[in-house]
Amino acid sequence: KARRSLLNAVQLSAYGIATPEPIGYAEERSALGGLEDSYYVTRYLTFTGADLQYEARSGEVNESLTRALATFLAELHECGIVHEDLSPGNIPYIYDRAKEEYTFMLVDLNRMHFTATPPSLRASIRNLDRLFAHPRATEALGRAYAEARGWEPAVVQPALEAACDSFWLHRLPKLALRYAQRAEGMSAPTFLRHYNAYLRWRRLRHLCPVGSWQRALHARESAFYTRYLEVEDVRRALAKRENYPHTPLS
């Protein structure tokens, strides 16, 4: 991983994409020569904006930041650069207040690849699905990214919304497990037993005709959702899909 990160950093620099300056890498090997650990070393940088974690989860859209980010992402894709873990923490930035300019960087470089041609619309959208969680932030990013790529916002925005819903729904069980462990001290086997029961109720409800059984199952699901899933259903995608009562996003 460390060697791959260094080589990717060198290639990014050749494209003019900012990343902390690589210094080298080190590997720890066993007596038999097997790789046990590796370390990638870069020059230390202070980031005035840190990363995009706040923007990712909050509904407060910074238009200038979003436009600058979308332009940066479009440039990456136009160059055929695909970072496979394009999460908020992996795009730190520096903000120059005097010039009112953002400089974005890429970190955690071991999972990325370079292509001879820009990724397709579908591949580009999938590459952005984990970046922003809040629907308002996703909408703003989709609009700005479409404009930067010369695509129709009316096509890009709903595609990005659907991709983000799918990504966060896929992550929801793992996030909910962590929440149950943190909030209630619940063990993983206990949570999984409850979660599997919830899935059975949901499948049965989908098979049931409209009636008292369906209402009873939906009530059970809703109670489980409120207790364990809602806090991590960051886009309320599951609540909307299954029609669960929920607290609207702020």
Protein language model annotation of sequence segments:
Residues 1-50, 68-79, 83-84, 103, ...:
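Conserved ATP-binding subdomain of kinase catalytic cores across diverse folds
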Residues 158-233:
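Non-catalytic N-terminal targeting/anchoring module and adjacent flexible stem/linker
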Residues 46, 88, 111:
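Short, glycine/acidic-enriched loop or turn micro-motifs at the edges of active sites
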Residues 62-66:
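Short alpha-helical scaffold element within the canonical Hanks-type protein kinase domain
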Residues 101-175:
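C-lobe/activation-segment region of protein kinase-like
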Residues 86-96:
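Hydrophobic residue at the +6 position relative to the catalytic HRD Asp in the kinase catalytic loop
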Residues 50-59:
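AlphaC helix of the protein kinase catalytic domain
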Residues 45-46, 96-98, 136:
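Short loop segments at secondary-structure junctions
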